[in-house]
């Protein structure tokens, strides 16, 4: 009996030793794997730091290049002014010489008239009749000059006084009027559908993807209206913003909603404001379900990705951020040299465009964060914007970007999509007499609409660059313009938000 117990004990000891050996082996393996993981983490952090350093170096080089370029431009301008001064001096000397020659000729003629026979009186001049025919060449953009940054403003946009406008090329209503380009037939008709009064300046307007609703942003309040009826269906106010008087509160106590954007399914609404916060609202309950924190200055622009899971934001803190709404975390931060005023996501979600105070439109890969294009005056034609870019919008096919600037122009950029070719400015739209504050493209890529501080909205023919008409429908700056995505070829809906505390919904009809 005792020998059998000894055998069991030996067997148990062997099993325990085997288990100990396995445990030691597993511990060593785990330690090895942990060490490998730590090595990988260390390498990843090192590479990420190197990538950030490279990116910062590139930004520093861009800034240095811009300063050098501006210095060269100033020197060129100085030399040009010197040449102009010399030309004027030479011209004045030549004119004085001509005047002396003319005086000598007149003296000779007077001497001849003393002895010459009386001349036959000249025939009366033929009366000149004023032509009522309009010279259309003054109103049409020369195809060879489409992309030029400097062009003449068409005459019908020079004087916006409706009383002086040709009756054949205007439409006048009690609350608005339309001026038409005389070089084209009046194919487009504009009518106001709804006028929506607000208690303060309307900073932004945005349609839902299905075109059934429109959201507006003003002081402390976001409102959602039914597009068909004009009925107010939601009034969104974050009451906690009044209670939490912290660093996010503005000195004046105001809290302007700078940007609004519907999610693709229309269930959520994102709002960006002066308090550096992005609020995500559930429209069915009219409650905030998420607050995204991270920006250090005002939020000026928002746009959803097509999948609805991500949101891009632009801020005065010189950054563009991509947010993962599933985690409420920022997944990517893109930093630039100056404040970001506007952002847009391409229709396929692969690209992000942003306009900035530094006169540049940047385009990034939305996945990697790599800078794909920089659209500015550094292009080979030197026809980029000459002042801050306040609005960008992708065309419906994603191949072009429209941009509006404080230099009073709208530009259309063609995206090459190839590393060996740079994107170019295809068209420069000239016609506004003050800052361009907002731009948008119609779904069929036929028209570009722009709103300006000159209180007007211009319909541009996207391909030719010709202004077709100007709508004067507000008593203050047109801060925001948006087009409904369900607009068709022959008719469409667009909206405007203004400093006159009104948002208006309009309809265009193509005859």
Curated annotation (Swiss-Prot):
CDD domains named among the record's database cross-references: WD40
Keyword Membrane belongs to the record: no
Positions annotated as WD repeat: 197-237, 252-293, 294-333, 335-374, 384-423, 431-470, 473-511
InterPro entries, sorted: G-protein_beta_WD-40_rep, Gprotein_B, Tscrpt_rep_Tup1_N, WD40/YVTN_repeat-like_dom_sf, WD40_repeat_CS, WD40_repeat_dom_sf, WD40_rpt
Pro residues: bias regions: 118-127
Low complexity bias locations: 95-117
Annotated protein name in UniProt: Transcriptional repressor TUP1
């Amino acid at each position: 009996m005792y020998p059998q117990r000894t055998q069991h004990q030996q067997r148990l000891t062997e099993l325990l030793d085997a288990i100990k050996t396995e445990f030691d082996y597993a511990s060593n393996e785990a330690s090895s794997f942990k060490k490998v993981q730590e090595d990988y983490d260390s390498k990843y952090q090192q590479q990420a730091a190197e990538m950030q350093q490279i990116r910062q170096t590139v930004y520093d080089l861009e800034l240095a290049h811009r300063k050098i370029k501006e210095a060269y431009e100033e020197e060129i301008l100085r030399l040009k002014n010197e040449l102009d001064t010399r030309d004027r001096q030479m011209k004045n000397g030549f004119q004085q010489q001509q005047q002396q020659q003319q005086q000598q000729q007149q003296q000779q003629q007077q001497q001849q008239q003393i002895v010459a026979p009386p001349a036959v009186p000249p025939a009366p001049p033929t009366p000149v009749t004023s032509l009522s025919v309009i010279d259309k060449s003054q109103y049409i953009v020369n195809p060879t000059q489409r992309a030029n940054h400097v062009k003449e403003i068409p005459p019908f946009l020079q004087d916006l006084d409706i009383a002086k406008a040709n009756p054949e090329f205007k439409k006048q209503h009690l609350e608005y009027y339309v001026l038409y380009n005389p070089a084209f037939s009046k194919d487009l008709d504009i009518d106001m559908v709804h006028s929506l009064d607000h208690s303060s300046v309307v900073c932004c307007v945005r349609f839902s993807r299905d075109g059934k609703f429109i959201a507006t942003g003003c002081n402390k309040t976001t409102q959602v209206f039914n597009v068909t009826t004009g009925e107010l269906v939601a009034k969104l106010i974050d009451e906690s913003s009044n209670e939490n008087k912290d660093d996010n509160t503005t000195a004046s106590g105001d809290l302007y909603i700078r940007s609004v954007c519907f999610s693709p399914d229309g269930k959520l609404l994102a709002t960006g404001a002066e308090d550096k916060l992005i609020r995500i609202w559930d429209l069915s309950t009219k409650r905030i379900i998420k607050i995204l924190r991270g920006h250090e200055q005002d939020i000026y622009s928002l746009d959803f990705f097509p999948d609805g899971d991500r949101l891009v934001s632009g801020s005065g803190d010189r950054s563009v951020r991509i947010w993962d709404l599933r985690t409420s975390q920022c997944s990517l931060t893109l930093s630039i040299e100056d404040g970001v005023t506007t952002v847009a996501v391409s229709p396929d979600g692969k690209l992000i465009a942003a306009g900035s105070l530094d006169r540049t439109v940047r385009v990034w890969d939305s996945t990697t964060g790599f800078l794909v294009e920089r659209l500015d005056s550094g292009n080979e034609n030197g026809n980029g914007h000459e002042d801050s870019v306040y609005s960008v919008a992708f065309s419906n096919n994603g191949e072009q970007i429209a941009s509006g600037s404080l230099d009073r122009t709208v530009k259309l950029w063609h995206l090459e999509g190839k590393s060996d070719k740079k994107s170019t400015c295809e068209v420069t739209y000239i016609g506004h007499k003050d800052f361009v504050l907002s731009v948008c493209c119609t779904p069929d890529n036929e028209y570009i609409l722009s709103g300006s501080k000159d209180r007007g909205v211009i319909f541009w023919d996207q391909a030719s660059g010709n202004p077709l008409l100007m709508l004067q429908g507000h008593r203050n700056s047109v801060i925001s313009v948006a087009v409904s995505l369900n607009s068709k070829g022959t008719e469409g809906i667009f909206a405007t938000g203004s400093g006159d505390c009104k948002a208006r919904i309009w309809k265009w009809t193509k005859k």
